[in-house]
Amino acid sequence: MIRGFFFKFFFYSGFVLICIIFLPALIMPSNIASFGGKLSGYWAKFCLRIFLSTKIIVKGLENIDRSSKFFIACTHQSQFETFFLQTIFESPFFILKKELIRIRIFGSFLKKIGCIEITRNKISKDNVDFYERVKLSIDKKNSPLIIFPQGTRYDVKERPDFKKGASRIYNLNIKCLPVVLNSGSVWPKKGVMKSNKKLIISILKPFEIGLDGNVFLKSLQNKMYEELDKIS
């Protein structure tokens, strides 16, 4: 518990400092703000190592084809992946709930790197053309979109069904790269942080375009949970 307290104190203090240092990036090219995000990811890794003795292992880097356009479907157990994935992928952007955009300063950085907001569980004018905006953003940017098909953070042992949004993005003729993490075993959504653990990021082989949307979604969920069972 004490180690977790020190981790959170130093990590969030450092994160706030990074945000302050990179404030000028809000009026500069977006890649400057993206670099601030990457720096936050490395800071998270450093703090986990120093305060919780966490060993971070990344598997499957050979499955990343940086010459093609793709979106990333990632399991979501912790805040960790929102920071650390920015160290693996070049200037990624996210789909996120509208409430996050409204957070002062932090929301401005999210908008700057091209994050796409959605109003969850509600039909709105913004949601009607949502997937068109996703397609335009992916075509325009030379960086991947990251989504969390579970919809929100879940406990390590939970296996909720994936949301249909993943298949709708896949049906835009964009291949999908699955990424599986056991981050909740170290940095859970709720409860005490764990020390002396291995935090594994497993990058699976991509799903090429051409599958039926429902077939894709079922196969994606099965493969990701199968891998999650292995590394948990």
Which residues fall in each region the model found?
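Short acidic-hydrophobic, aromatic-tinged amphipathic segments that line or gate anion-handling sites
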Residues: 58, 116-119, 209
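Structural element of the ATP-grasp superfamily
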Residues: 47-48, 85, 110, 169-170, ...
